[in-house]
Every structure is written in structure tokens, then in C-alpha cells.
């Protein structure tokens, strides 16, 4: 097979994902899973040489542009990776000649992508080539590249053409207009462009270094230009077994970067900043720049690495998930958040969904709470967009968009795929009626506060969001006079195969929770810091009558539940719909649409992803074990898992009901969504939520971590194939290590500074322990 998981050796065992053979058809898969990033920019792993099936991509977080008649998307900035290599007159292309050996691998411990090739050209010339690259954690604006070329059985001329290509597009859409091109006397060069609609200035600058047999040379370079293109071409005479090295240091800046926020700058200032940064970095060799980057990664891994005593693939898969969660997240800037595909591809146009708050955020809450806070601050910075959406739809308060970009306004496209039977494009209703995201944001805020105790966040951001979103729900509820209850009609729940439904259980239960928690927060703040509360009340003009309205309405919200069967109907009428045998459609996303029309699917008990099961996970303390078990077994056979968000939730709930085989089966399913052997699984980018779900399945699922009555609970159950599970987390700001064995659980502080520690109450397997400078051990 083209992918291997076991080629990491020694200290790199279970840290390496390998591509072991070249196949142009597989390029999109590896471009995605081998993508590099640092939260500021993400780089798809397109090869240096060009192929027909490639999708080259470099994306800067928070940078959006809108083409006429379309929604805003993350534009593909000028490509700085591509190059043309000619070896004794023959173009280096792996579709020609013969591949003697090939190995490309991503090292997630170091954050480096390496490709080693031995290639025989059609003329019989054999060349060894090594390509290395990284996107720096030490300098968010920097990417580094190194290439080695060794002619094995010939002497001849080697030519390299590389530079910057601004003709790249987003699936054909060109977002940039021409700027400047410069080649400077000191070896620096750059290309500038500007987005067409949003007007964001962008510079890609670089400096190249060439060596033959480790001695630096200054080759004559030919300048090649085109529209939005600047390349430098150079030639070298190499003897047999001589080694040519090229190092490239690239710097990227844009006009929306945090460094320039609220500053009176022009494009010249941005160019100067980029060139100054390049001057400092350009004096360093690849190894030095990479070493600085690698040290940052190793420091991160010291804080977050999870150790699994089980199958090697499980260990690798969790590290793969954590690596990508870190590299795709804009931890430097609270004005932006994590896109559904991270920074690894054009899928979903770089938009932010509920994926961030419900699936990705928990990883950061428990490992890097300062980053989690910034992701939540994004929702505060875009609160005006949510207020605007509420007004435009006739509601009060703040109604978060289903898909969000930089402003917080709704960016969901109106139409999607074509219906196989009608031939008409399917209307996408999510932007109008998939409204549970507003409760999801509130849930994430409360989850963050429970784990961190960050009052300052609640004072300045969280409470205002909670009150404004509670306002929305109070205005959204519809009173059913005949049944004396409040309902929520015409919505989409998490299951997007059921549209225009009434009283989606997930939505209704979450709204009741939302209103209750808003009242609790109001009362808490009234006691804790009345002056802060008064400031918020005055800012948003919150009246006491509104609070009384919330209290009245929350107690009358209809919560679907069948007392006899203990099943929660997913929505009104769901239990009366036809049941389709979906077994033959599982495992092939969208396959059911080739056999049934959209209307047939939406009117049957066919579920795209966890819906009621999702509810049981998030509000688990509100439901008995019996209710969880009966609903899991009712809904699981009806769920296609056509969304990558679904398997990890079923893994967690499988463990919750005590079915470890089921839990482990779904954990395996979640780990193979991106990393598995399906070569078509992630062409458009990574499944960010799924990666967050993998971490949750391990730590919050098998590790049993949850917050109950404001106390950290640890109630683990390990899969049969695991002997141990070790992980670290932060609770109320204190680093804690958890070690789980089949016969015991130990919990200890990681900080040796006793002055920084405080007594912590931890519930382990139902036993209340005091953690105060000592390791607490519970025998099972």
C-alpha cells in the first residue's frame, strides 16, 4: 500500500506517517495529511515539481475574499513551493523514467516533511534527491525548504527554476490582482498581490542559498516573470556524486496581520517589515531555523503527548490528531478561529462551524486554556454579526451564523450538490434554520469556565455572549397554546438529513439548558461582582422583565421523551417515518443519495450523524444510564456516519454505556477518516472536528474525564487492547498527570513549585480524593 505507519524507529517510533510509493492519483490525500502549518499559515504538501492532479495551496488564517455572486472564502495565496528541476536537460517528473526508491514522510514530533527519491530518467541517468520543509512555530511568518541533488551515474547540468506563482486559484477563482515584483541586489526577492474584493495586501518574500559539496556559491540567476509571477532560474555543472544543495527561506505577511492592527500603515510598511524579518532569518542555515522550530514542537509535546499501551496505530493516530489540531489553530489571534478544514485545503471555504466549539475546543480547554480562550473571544469579536443575523430574521439578541468567516455574518452557500433524480441543485437550509450553533457556543463558554475558573473571561466576554444568545432563544420560542408549552419549529438539528423539522430534541434540550445557565450566570455574577453585572446590563440594555421571561419560558420548553420506551424522538413525527436498511450504504459517504432522492432520505429514519446521541453526550448528567443505553441502541443502527463528526461521539457514548467493543470500533473508525488507507477520504482538506473528536474519545471517553458538580471526575475504562493510558491536562490552571492501568488510576501534579499548587478535589472511580502535593492512587 502507498501509506505506512510503522517506519518510525527509535525515538521516532509512532511519530512518522509515510508515503512509500508515488502515485499521482494519490496526491490530494497526501497533500492534505502531510500539510504543515503554525496557525498563521498552512501549506498543503504539494510536491516541488508539478503534476496534473495536484492542488497547490497556502492559506493565511483569517484572510477572506469574496468573488462576485459567491460567499467569502479563504484565498490561496501565491505558491512559493513549486519549482522546475532539469537534470542534464531532462525534466524531473516521477511519471517518466523509473523510480528506484521513494519515501516521503511527515514527522509529527518535529513538524517536518521529508521526501527521499532515487530516480532514473528516460535517458538512464540516476539521481538522488532529498526534499525537506517546515512551517515555523518559532516565527509564524516563516517557511523553510532544503533540497539536495546528487547525480549518481553521470555528470551534467542541473537547472532549477523557483520563485513565486500568484496565478494559483481557488478551484478556478482568482482572488488576487497584480502587485510588485522585485529582485534585490542582496539576494532577496519578493512578489506582492492584493485581494480583489477585500483589498488585503500580501507579500511573499524569499532568499535562496546554493551550495556544492557544502561550499556556498553565488550562481548567475536568470529572472523570469509573468502575470503575478516571479521566478529565478540558475544552472550548475555537477560531476558524478557531487552534491548540490538549495535552501530557501520564505517570509509571508498580509495587511490584516495582528502586527498591523490599529496602525496607520501602507503597503510599503508591510514590505519593509517582511524584508526586515527576512534579513534576520536569511542569515541562518536551514538546520538552525529548523532547530528553533523543532524545539517549539518538542516543548509542546512535553505538555500534550498522550501515551497509549496498545496497538502502534492507535498511538500514532492520536499524535497525528494532536499535531494537526495545533498546526491549524490560530493561537496568536483572537479575531479568527479554526476552519472546518483547518488550513489544509479549500473545503468549506475556510469557514468556521460548530465544529470548533464542540469538537476542537475541548482539546485546548484541557491542554492550552489560553488558546481556548482566544477561540472563544472570536465569538465575542463577531457578536455584532450575530446580532445582525438575529435582527434580519426578526429575532432579538444574537443568533450565530451556521458558517462564519471574519465578520460573524452568515456565509453559508444557498445551494449545494445536484439531486440525482430531479437534476436540480439541492437547497442548503443550514444557514437559515440550523440554529443550534447558538446554544453550542454558549455550551463551550460554560465548559471553558468550569475547567479554568477564568472569571475575567466571563466578566469581559462570556456573560455578554450568554445574555445576548439567551435573548435570541427567548424570542425564537413559539408558544403552543393548546398544549401550554413552548416549541421550536422549522429547524435542522445536528442530523442534516432531516430538514424543516419541529422540536428537534437536541435543539430543544440545549435551549432549555442555555436559558437555565444564563439565569445561573446572572445570579452568580450578581453575588460575585455586581458592578460588572451592572456594566453588562447597561451595555446591552437587559431588563429584569427579560430575565423573568426566560424563567417562565424555560420551564415550559417541550422536551421530547417517550416514557414507556425511554426513547427521545429526534423530532416530531420521527418515530412514524419509514425505516430504511442502511447497512449497505455505511462506509461510503453519500452513497445513499445514489439510490434514494433527497425527499426520500429526509422523510425516512435515516440519520447522517449523531443527533440524539450527541445530546446524551453533552448533557449526559441529565440522563440516566438506562436512557442513554436505550437511545444509543435505537439510533445507532439508523446512523450512516456520513459526517466525520459522528464516529468519535459514538465511541464516547459506547464507553458510557459500558460497551467497550462498540466504543473501540468507533474509535478506530474515527482514526481512519483522514489517516486511513482510503485515498479519496480528504482531498479537500482535513476533517478538523474529527481530529478533535479523536482526542475527546481518548481523554474524555476512555480516560473518563468530565466535570460533574464543578469537580474533576475521572472514571476510565480502557479498551481490551490497551494496557495503559497516560495523559496530561490542566485543571483550574494547574497541570495534572493521569496514569491509568487496568488495576489502578494515579493522579499527580506536574508542577514542582508547591507555592503554585492548591488543594484539588478529584473524583476517581467514585472516590473523592484530595490532591495536595502528593500523588493520589486508586486501586481498581
From Swiss-Prot:
Active site: 496
The UniProt record lists the keyword Transferase: yes
Pfam families: Glyco_hydro_65C (PF03633), Glyco_hydro_65m (PF03632), Glyco_hydro_65N (PF03636)
SS bond list: none
Membrane-crossing residue ranges in chain numbering: none
Reactions listed under catalytic activity: kojibiose + phosphate = beta-D-glucose 1-phosphate + D-glucose
Binding-site residues, substrate: 354-355, 608-609
Key words, A-Z: Carbohydrate metabolism, Glycosyltransferase, Transferase
GO MF annotation terms: carbohydrate binding; hydrolase activity, hydrolyzing O-glycosyl compounds; kojibiose phosphorylase activity
Enzyme class at the top of the EC tree: transferase
EC number of this enzyme: 2.4.1.230
GO biological process per UniProt: carbohydrate metabolic process
Entry superkingdom: Bacteria
Described purpose of this protein according to its UniProt entry: Catalyzes the reversible phosphorolysis of kojibiose into beta-D-glucose 1-phosphate (Glc1P) and D-glucose. In the reverse direction, uses Glc1P as acceptor to produce alpha-1,2-glucans up to a degree of polymerization of 6.
Family indicated by similarity: Belongs to the glycosyl hydrolase 65 family.
Protein name in UniProt: Kojibiose phosphorylase
Organism field: Halothermothrix orenii (strain H 168 / OCM 544 / DSM 9562)
Amino acid at each position: 500500500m502507498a501509506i505506512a505507519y510503522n517506519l518510525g524507529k527509535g525515538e521516532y517510533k509512532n511519530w512518522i506517517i509515510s508515503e512509500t510509493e508515488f502515485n499521482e492519483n494519490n496526491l490530494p490525500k497526501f497533500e492534505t495529511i502531510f500539510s504543515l502549518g503554525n496557525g498563521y499559515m498552512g501549506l498543503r504538501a504539494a510536491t516541488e515539481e508539478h503534476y496534473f492532479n495536484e492542488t497547490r495551496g497556502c492559506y493565511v488564517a483569517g484572510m477572506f475574499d469574496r468573488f462576485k455572486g459567491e460567499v467569502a472564502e479563504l484565498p490561496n495565496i501565491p505558491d512559493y513551493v513549486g519549482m522546475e528541476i532539469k537534470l542534464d536537460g531532462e525534466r524531473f517528473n516521477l511519471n517518466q523514467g523509473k523510480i528506484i526508491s521513494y519515501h516521503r514522510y511527515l514527522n509529527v514530533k518535529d513538524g517536518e516533511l521529508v521526501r527521499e527519491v532515487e530516480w532514473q530518467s528516460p535517458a538512464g541517468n540516476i539521481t538522488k534527491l532529498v526534499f525537506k520543509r517546515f512551517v515555523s512555530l518559532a516565527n509564524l511568518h516563516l517557511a523553510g525548504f532544503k533540497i539536495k541533488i546528487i547525480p549518481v551515474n553521470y555528470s551534467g547540468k542541473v537547472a532549477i527554476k523557483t520563485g513565486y506563482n500568484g496565478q494559483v486559484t481557488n478551484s478556478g477563482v482568482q482572488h488576487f490582482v497584480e502587485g510588485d515584483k522585485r529582485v534585490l541586489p542582496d539576494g532577496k526577492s519578493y512578489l506582492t498581490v492584493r485581494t480583489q474584493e477585500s483589498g488585503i495586501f500580501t507579500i511573499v518574500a524569499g532568499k535562496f542559498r546554493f551550495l556544492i559539496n557544502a561550499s556556498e556559491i553565488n550562481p548567475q540567476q536568470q529572472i523570469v516573470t509573468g502575470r503575478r509571477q516571479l521566478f529565478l532560474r540558475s544552472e550548475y555543472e555537477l560531476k558524478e556524486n557531487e552534491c548540490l544543495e538549495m535552501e530557501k527561506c520564505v517570509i509571508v505577511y498580509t495587511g490584516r496581520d495582528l502586527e498591523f492592527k490599529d496602525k496607520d500603515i501602507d503597503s510599503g510598511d508591510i514590505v519593509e517589515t517582511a524584508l526586515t524579518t527576512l534579513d534576520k532569518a536569511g542569515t541562518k542555515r536551514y538546520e538552525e531555523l529548523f532547530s528553533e522550530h523543532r524545539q517549539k514542537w518538542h516543548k509542546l509535546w512535553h505538555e500534550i503527548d498522550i501515551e497509549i499501551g496498545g496497538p502502534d496505530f492507535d498511538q500514532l493516530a492520536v499524535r497525528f490528531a494532536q499535531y494537526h489540531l495545533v498546526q491549524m489553530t490560530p493561537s496568536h489571534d483572537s479575531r479568527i478561529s479554526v476552519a472546518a478544514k483547518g488550513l489544509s485545503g479549500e473545503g468549506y471555504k475556510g469557514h468556521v462551524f460548530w465544529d470548533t466549539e464542540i469538537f476542537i475546543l475541548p482539546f485546548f480547554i484541557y491542554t492550552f486554556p489560553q488558546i481556548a480562550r482566544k477561540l472563544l473571544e472570536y465569538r465575542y469579536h463577531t457578536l455584532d454579526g450575530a446580532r445582525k443575523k438575529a435582527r434580519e430574521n426578526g429575532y432579538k439578541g444574537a443568533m450565530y451564523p451556521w458558517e462564519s468567516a471574519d465578520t460573524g455574518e452568515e456565509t453559508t452557500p444557498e445551494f449545494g450538490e445536484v439531486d440525482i433524480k430531479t437534476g436540480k441543485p439541492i437547497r442548503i437550509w443550514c444557514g437559515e434554520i440550523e440554529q443550534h450553533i447558538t446554544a453550542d457556543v454558549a455550551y463551550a463558554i460554560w465548559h471553558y469556565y468550569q475547567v479554568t475558573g477564568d472569571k475575567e473571561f466571563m466578566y469581559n466576554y462570556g456573560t455578554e455572549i450568554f445574555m445576548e444568545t439567551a435573548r435570541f432563544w427567548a424570542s425564537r420560542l413559539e408558544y403552543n397554546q393548546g398544549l401550554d408549552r413552548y416549541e421550536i419549529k422549522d429547524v435542522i438539528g445536528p442530523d442534516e438529513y432531516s430538514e424543516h423539522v419541529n422540536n428537534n430534541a437536541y435543539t430543544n434540550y440545549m435551549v432549555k439548558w442555555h436559558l437555565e445557565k444564563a439565569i445561573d450566570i446572572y445570579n452568580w455574577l450578581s453575588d460575585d461582582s455586581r458592578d460588572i453585572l451592572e456594566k453588562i446590563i447597561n451595555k446591552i440594555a437587559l431588563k429584569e422583565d427579560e430575565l423573568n421571561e426566560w424563567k417562565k419560558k424555560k420551564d415550559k420548553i417541550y422536551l421530547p421523551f417517550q416514557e414507556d420506551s425511554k426513547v427521545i424522538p429526534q423530532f416530531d413525527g420521527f418515530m412514524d417515518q419509514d425505516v430504511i436498511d442502511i447497512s449497505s450504504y455505511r462506509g461510503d459517504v453519500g452513497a445513499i443519495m445514489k439510490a434514494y432522492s433527497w425527499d426520500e432520505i429526509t422523510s425516512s429514519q435515516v440519520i447522517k450523524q449523531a443527533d440524539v446521541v450527541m445530546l446524551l453526550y453533552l448533557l449526559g448528567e441529565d440522563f440516566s444510564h438506562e436512557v442513554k443505553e436505550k437511545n444509543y441502541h435505537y439510533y445507532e443502527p439508523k446512523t450512516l456516519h456520513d459526517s466525520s463528526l459522528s464516529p468519535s461521539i459514538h465511541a464516547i457514548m459506547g464507553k458510557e454505556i459500558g460497551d467497550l467493543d462498540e466504543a473501540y470500533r468507533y474509535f478506530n473508525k474515527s482514526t481512519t477518516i483522514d489517516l486511513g488507507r482510503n485515498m479519496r477520504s480528504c482531498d479537500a482538506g482535513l476533517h478538523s472536528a474529527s481530529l478533535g473528536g479523536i482526542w475527546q474519545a481518548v481523554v474524555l471517553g476512555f480516560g473518563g474525564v468530565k466535570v460533574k458538580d464543578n469537580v474533576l471526575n475521572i472514571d476510565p475504562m480502557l479498551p481490551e487492547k490497551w494496557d495503559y493510558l497516560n495523559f496530561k491536562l490542566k485543571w483550574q490552571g494547574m497541570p495534572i498527570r493521569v496514569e491509568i492501568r487496568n488495576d489502578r488510576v494515579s493522579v499527580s501534579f506536574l508542577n514542582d513549585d508547591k507555592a503554585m499548587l492548591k488543594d484539588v478535589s478529584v473524583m476517581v472511580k467514585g472516590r473523592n480524593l484530595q490532591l495536595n502535593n502528593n500523588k493520589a492512587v486508586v486501586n481498581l
